[in-house]
Amino acid sequence: MSINVTEIVLHQLQQTAGETAELHTVLREDLLAISPEVEQMMLQLHQAYQNKAKAYGIFQSESIFAQQLNRLLEGESEFLPFSHSCAKMLATELVKYPFASGGTFILCRYTFLATEYLFIALIDSRASMLVDDKLEVKRTEYLDITQYDIACRINLTELKHNAQSNRYLTFIKGRVGRKVADFFMDFLGAEEGLNPQVQNQTLLQAVSDYCEQGELDSNQTQAVKKQVFEYCKGQINSGEEIAISELSASMPTLKEIDFADFAEQQEYGLEESIPPVRNALKTLTKYSGSGKGVTISFDAELLSQRIIWDELNDTLTIKGLPANLRDQLERNK
């Protein structure tokens, strides 16, 4: 797969020494020349971004960033001054947070698989060693383009054709204890858009309700849920979203209504396609839970067969322990 870089520029955000944290911007005065090395770097950044956990956002009506982006897309401004303004706004927002640090600011407009994107990231540098042509060991620094968590991407194609979309903007979810998502929302002048977790949970509820209205017994219901899970797992493995129409076609029609029509009639608010969330979808075929030093996970089809739930006494009875668990118990009795 190839990537077509249209415009790209690098700037530096440098943290100044002293008691009060400040970020100083070092701005390029021209765009980077587009070379095979530049395109290879952007391809790696694109691929790394694809594999990261992301949240969705939309621009607020008063977003300064969105206003400047619109002028760029309308041809009223150039990419370089736009990038200068972005770097300064990013530094202004980032310095408000305790994790503020410098890095290389990358702003790139590119096309991948007929979709145009604007990619924005702050990349850390890492120290390493190299051996030169005289076999001398020297210290060097390199851009850590696979490990980064301050980045966002705007789907310009979708933004141009559907400004009311709730998913044209994505950004990397921050690590626990870091409000990366918060500062990026402030920098972009954005608010939460599509919530994949909520959409996945709503999908699971819709599937359960569909089976219930179809008057399926527990075994039939579990068979349908397994079908749904297999389709969703295939979408995850191929990097695709859950298409409700495709999912519906893979499911049985119950009471003369297919799943897609049922979901629409019941007004669940499902999108036509949903980014899959693996952990949420696992509950289609598994029961799991942990607490008070106990962790339990088992296939849903085992309930009422090898796993017996006594709701009144709040107990689970397991018939036929896993061999490795039984061995551990015997060794430590």
Swiss-Prot record:
One of its GO terms (cellular component) is cytoplasm. GO terms for molecular function: double-stranded DNA binding; single-stranded RNA binding. It is found in: Cytoplasm, Nucleoid. It comes from the Bacteria. Keywords: Cytoplasm. The keyword Cytoplasm applies. Pfam families: NA37 (PF04245). Its main location: cytoplasm. Belongs to the YejK family. This is Nucleoid-associated protein HAPS_0704. It comes from Glaesserella parasuis serovar 5 (strain SH0165).
